[in-house]
Amino acid sequence: MSAVQGHWREVSEQTLPAATYLNDSTRTSSQLIIIVERKEDWASYFPSEDIVTAQEYLEQSGDREQGKRVQVINLCRSYKYLGHGYYCSLLAEARGHKVIPSVRTISELTRKSLYGLALDDLDKTLEKALSHHAYSDTEGFTLTLYFGKTNIEPLQDLARQLFEIFACPILLVEFRRTNGWHIEGIKFGALHKLREDQEDQFAHSLDSFS
Protein backbone atom coordinates (compact mmCIF):
# COMPACT_ATOMS: atom_id res chain seq x y z
CA MET A 1 0.00 0.00 0.00
CA SER A 2 1.42 3.40 -0.96
CA ALA A 3 1.77 6.29 1.49
CA VAL A 4 -1.00 8.13 -0.31
CA GLN A 5 -3.34 5.16 -0.14
CA GLY A 6 -2.50 4.50 3.48
CA HIS A 7 -3.21 8.04 4.54
CA TRP A 8 -6.38 8.18 2.48
CA ARG A 9 -7.57 5.41 4.79
CA GLU A 10 -6.42 7.43 7.80
CA VAL A 11 -8.33 10.47 6.61
CA SER A 12 -11.43 8.60 5.53
CA GLU A 13 -11.75 6.93 8.93
CA GLN A 14 -11.78 10.29 10.71
CA THR A 15 -14.37 12.97 10.93
CA LEU A 16 -12.92 15.87 8.98
CA PRO A 17 -13.17 18.87 11.31
CA ALA A 18 -12.85 22.48 10.33
CA ALA A 19 -9.42 23.80 11.27
CA THR A 20 -9.72 24.54 14.97
CA TYR A 21 -7.25 25.74 17.53
CA LEU A 22 -6.63 24.95 21.16
CA ASN A 23 -7.58 27.66 23.62
CA ASP A 24 -4.87 29.67 25.32
CA SER A 25 -4.81 27.45 28.38
CA THR A 26 -3.96 24.32 26.39
CA ARG A 27 -2.03 25.72 23.43
CA THR A 28 1.61 25.01 24.08
CA SER A 29 3.25 26.41 20.97
CA SER A 30 2.84 27.04 17.28
CA GLN A 31 4.53 25.36 14.36
CA LEU A 32 4.98 26.11 10.68
CA ILE A 33 5.17 23.27 8.16
CA ILE A 34 6.06 23.98 4.53
CA ILE A 35 5.36 21.09 2.17
CA VAL A 36 7.22 20.80 -1.13
CA GLU A 37 6.90 18.11 -3.77
CA ARG A 38 10.65 17.59 -3.94
CA LYS A 39 13.53 18.89 -1.85
CA GLU A 40 15.07 20.56 -4.90
CA ASP A 41 12.00 22.79 -5.21
CA TRP A 42 13.36 24.66 -2.17
CA ALA A 43 16.95 24.83 -3.48
CA SER A 44 16.79 28.58 -4.19
CA TYR A 45 15.90 29.44 -0.59
CA PHE A 46 17.59 29.22 2.79
CA PRO A 47 17.50 25.74 4.33
CA SER A 48 14.81 25.43 6.98
CA GLU A 49 13.74 22.72 9.38
CA ASP A 50 10.15 23.72 8.56
CA ILE A 51 10.46 22.11 5.10
CA VAL A 52 9.13 18.59 4.53
CA THR A 53 8.37 16.75 1.32
CA ALA A 54 4.84 15.66 0.52
CA GLN A 55 5.88 12.04 1.00
CA GLU A 56 7.33 12.79 4.43
CA TYR A 57 4.22 14.65 5.54
CA LEU A 58 1.95 11.83 4.41
CA GLU A 59 4.08 9.26 6.22
CA GLN A 60 4.30 11.18 9.50
CA SER A 61 1.88 10.17 12.23
CA GLY A 62 1.18 13.74 13.30
CA ASP A 63 1.86 12.92 16.95
CA ARG A 64 4.66 15.49 17.17
CA GLU A 65 2.19 18.29 16.47
CA GLN A 66 -0.25 17.30 19.21
CA GLY A 67 -1.18 20.33 21.31
CA LYS A 68 0.35 22.76 18.84
CA ARG A 69 -1.24 25.39 16.63
CA VAL A 70 0.00 24.30 13.22
CA GLN A 71 0.07 26.33 10.01
CA VAL A 72 0.70 24.26 6.89
CA ILE A 73 1.75 25.86 3.61
CA ASN A 74 1.24 23.34 0.83
CA LEU A 75 3.61 24.10 -2.06
CA CYS A 76 3.16 20.87 -3.99
CA ARG A 77 3.63 21.08 -7.75
CA SER A 78 0.04 20.04 -8.39
CA TYR A 79 -3.20 19.90 -6.41
CA LYS A 80 -5.03 17.61 -8.79
CA TYR A 81 -7.66 15.38 -7.26
CA LEU A 82 -6.17 12.35 -5.47
CA GLY A 83 -2.63 13.59 -6.08
CA HIS A 84 -0.04 14.27 -3.38
CA GLY A 85 -0.90 17.96 -3.13
CA TYR A 86 -4.59 17.21 -2.67
CA TYR A 87 -3.93 14.53 -0.06
CA CYS A 88 -1.56 16.77 1.92
CA SER A 89 -4.25 19.44 2.33
CA LEU A 90 -6.86 16.79 3.10
CA LEU A 91 -4.68 15.18 5.76
CA ALA A 92 -3.74 18.56 7.26
CA GLU A 93 -7.42 19.39 7.75
CA ALA A 94 -8.07 15.97 9.28
CA ARG A 95 -5.31 16.69 11.81
CA GLY A 96 -6.81 20.05 12.69
CA HIS A 97 -4.03 22.01 11.02
CA LYS A 98 -4.69 25.32 9.28
CA VAL A 99 -3.61 24.73 5.69
CA ILE A 100 -3.40 26.76 2.51
CA PRO A 101 -4.71 25.95 0.05
CA SER A 102 -7.66 24.29 1.76
CA VAL A 103 -9.46 21.37 0.15
CA ARG A 104 -12.35 23.72 -0.56
CA THR A 105 -10.10 26.17 -2.40
CA ILE A 106 -8.54 23.34 -4.38
CA SER A 107 -11.97 22.09 -5.39
CA GLU A 108 -13.31 25.54 -6.28
CA LEU A 109 -10.38 26.54 -8.48
CA THR A 110 -10.64 23.41 -10.59
CA ARG A 111 -13.70 24.80 -12.39
CA LYS A 112 -14.61 28.37 -13.24
CA SER A 113 -18.28 27.50 -12.79
CA LEU A 114 -17.49 27.08 -9.09
CA TYR A 115 -15.45 30.23 -8.52
CA GLY A 116 -16.86 32.56 -11.19
CA LEU A 117 -19.65 33.98 -9.05
CA ALA A 118 -17.17 35.05 -6.39
CA LEU A 119 -15.40 37.24 -8.96
CA ASP A 120 -18.35 39.32 -10.11
CA ASP A 121 -17.98 41.95 -7.39
CA LEU A 122 -14.23 42.19 -8.01
CA ASP A 123 -14.56 43.27 -11.63
CA LYS A 124 -15.63 46.75 -10.53
CA THR A 125 -12.55 47.00 -8.32
CA LEU A 126 -10.40 45.84 -11.22
CA GLU A 127 -11.85 48.35 -13.67
CA LYS A 128 -11.17 51.22 -11.29
CA ALA A 129 -7.64 50.02 -10.48
CA LEU A 130 -6.59 49.73 -14.13
CA SER A 131 -8.30 52.82 -15.53
CA HIS A 132 -5.11 54.93 -15.32
CA HIS A 133 -2.48 52.18 -15.24
CA ALA A 134 -0.02 51.14 -17.95
CA TYR A 135 -1.97 47.93 -18.46
CA SER A 136 -5.00 49.95 -19.51
CA ASP A 137 -3.67 49.97 -23.10
CA THR A 138 -3.35 46.18 -23.34
CA GLU A 139 -5.96 43.55 -24.11
CA GLY A 140 -4.92 41.30 -21.28
CA PHE A 141 -2.19 40.12 -18.95
CA THR A 142 -1.48 37.49 -16.30
CA LEU A 143 -0.53 38.48 -12.77
CA THR A 144 1.22 36.23 -10.27
CA LEU A 145 0.19 36.71 -6.65
CA TYR A 146 2.22 35.52 -3.68
CA PHE A 147 0.18 35.12 -0.50
CA GLY A 148 -2.16 37.83 -1.76
CA LYS A 149 0.58 40.32 -2.60
CA THR A 150 1.70 41.98 -5.83
CA ASN A 151 4.25 44.64 -6.74
CA ILE A 152 1.64 46.45 -8.83
CA GLU A 153 0.33 48.91 -6.27
CA PRO A 154 -3.03 49.72 -7.93
CA LEU A 155 -3.88 46.01 -7.84
CA GLN A 156 -2.77 45.34 -4.26
CA ASP A 157 -6.26 45.73 -2.81
CA LEU A 158 -7.64 43.35 -5.42
CA ALA A 159 -4.84 40.87 -4.70
CA ARG A 160 -5.70 40.94 -1.01
CA GLN A 161 -9.39 40.33 -1.75
CA LEU A 162 -8.55 37.40 -4.01
CA PHE A 163 -6.40 35.87 -1.29
CA GLU A 164 -9.21 36.25 1.23
CA ILE A 165 -11.49 34.28 -1.11
CA PHE A 166 -8.94 31.81 -2.47
CA ALA A 167 -6.13 31.54 0.07
CA CYS A 168 -3.28 29.97 -1.86
CA PRO A 169 0.50 30.52 -1.76
CA ILE A 170 0.83 31.25 -5.49
CA LEU A 171 -2.03 32.27 -7.77
CA LEU A 172 -1.96 33.04 -11.49
CA VAL A 173 -4.73 35.49 -12.34
CA GLU A 174 -5.58 36.16 -15.98
CA PHE A 175 -7.13 39.55 -16.80
CA ARG A 176 -8.89 40.35 -20.08
CA ARG A 177 -10.50 43.48 -21.48
CA THR A 178 -13.69 43.05 -23.50
CA ASN A 179 -16.01 45.99 -22.96
CA GLY A 180 -14.29 46.52 -19.64
CA TRP A 181 -11.78 44.63 -17.55
CA HIS A 182 -12.65 41.29 -15.98
CA ILE A 183 -10.92 38.27 -14.47
CA GLU A 184 -10.81 35.62 -17.16
CA GLY A 185 -9.44 32.84 -15.00
CA ILE A 186 -7.51 31.82 -11.90
CA LYS A 187 -5.21 28.86 -11.49
CA PHE A 188 -2.56 27.63 -9.11
CA GLY A 189 1.06 28.65 -9.55
CA ALA A 190 4.00 26.34 -8.85
CA LEU A 191 7.11 27.10 -6.82
CA HIS A 192 9.50 25.22 -9.10
CA LYS A 193 8.40 27.27 -12.13
CA LEU A 194 9.21 30.70 -10.68
CA ARG A 195 11.86 32.86 -12.33
CA GLU A 196 14.70 34.27 -10.24
CA ASP A 197 13.03 37.66 -9.82
CA GLN A 198 9.78 35.93 -8.87
CA GLU A 199 11.61 33.82 -6.29
CA ASP A 200 12.61 37.01 -4.48
CA GLN A 201 9.02 38.25 -4.46
CA PHE A 202 7.82 34.89 -3.18
CA ALA A 203 10.41 34.83 -0.38
CA HIS A 204 9.49 38.31 0.84
CA SER A 205 5.78 37.52 0.73
CA LEU A 206 6.31 34.25 2.60
CA ASP A 207 8.24 36.07 5.33
CA SER A 208 5.41 38.57 5.71
CA PHE A 209 2.78 35.82 5.82
CA SER A 210 4.51 33.50 8.25
Predicted features by range, described:
Residues 2-210:
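Preference for protein termini
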